[in-house]
Design a protein with these regions (language model features):
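Core catalytic alpha/beta fold that binds nucleotide/phospho-ligands
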Residues: 1-127
Length: 127
C-alpha cells in the first residue's frame, strides 16, 4: 500500500549559488553525494540539485516535511544499474522509523536548468 508520495523541483542555479558559500554544500549533502557529484565534472551542480530535490520529495512523502531530520542524513546513491536509492542515517533514520518506516522508491530526472525528484513510500505492513 502506498503511504506517501512527494515531488520536488530544484533550479540548478540555486545549487550553483550554494557552491559559492563556504560550508553550505557540506551542510546539506552527505560526503558520498558530494564525492559522486564532483566525479561528474561539469554536471556536478545538476547532480546535487537532483539529490536536493530527492531530500525535499522524501520529506513530502513522509507527510511531515523534514522536521527533526538533518538533510545530510538523507542521501542518494546510485546502484550499478544507475537506479537512485535513498539512504537514511542518524536523525532521518530515527524519524522515519518513528513514522512507521517503509520501502522508499525514488526517481530523478532533469531538463535544462531544472532537476526533479519523485519519492514514493510503500507501507511494509499488510492491511
Amino acid at each position: 500500500m502506498i503511504r506517501g508520495i512527494g515531488i520536488d523541483i530544484v533550479h540548478v542555479g540555486r545549487i550553483r549559488h550554494w557552491s559559492t558559500v563556504p560550508g553550505l554544500v557540506e551542510r546539506f549533502f552527505h560526503p558520498a553525494e558530494i564525492e559522486a557529484a564532483v566525479s561528474r565534472g561539469s554536471s556536478k551542480d545538476l547532480s546535487l540539485a537532483a539529490r536536493f530535490a530527492a531530500k525535499e520529495a522524501f520529506g513530502k512523502a513522509c507527510g511531515t516535511g523534514l522536521a527533526e531530520m538533518k538533510l545530510k542524513d538523507i542521501y542518494v546513491r546510485n546502484e550499478r544499474s544507475g537506479r537512485p536509492v535513498i539512504i537514511l542515517e542518524g536523525t532521518a533514520e530515527k524519524r522515519f522509523a518513528e513514522l512507521g518506516g517503509g520501502i522508499i522508491h525514488c526517481s530523478l530526472t532533469h531538463e535544462g536548468e531544472n532537476a526533479v525528484a519523485m519519492v514514493l513510500i510503500e507501507d511494509t505492513q499488510s492491511t
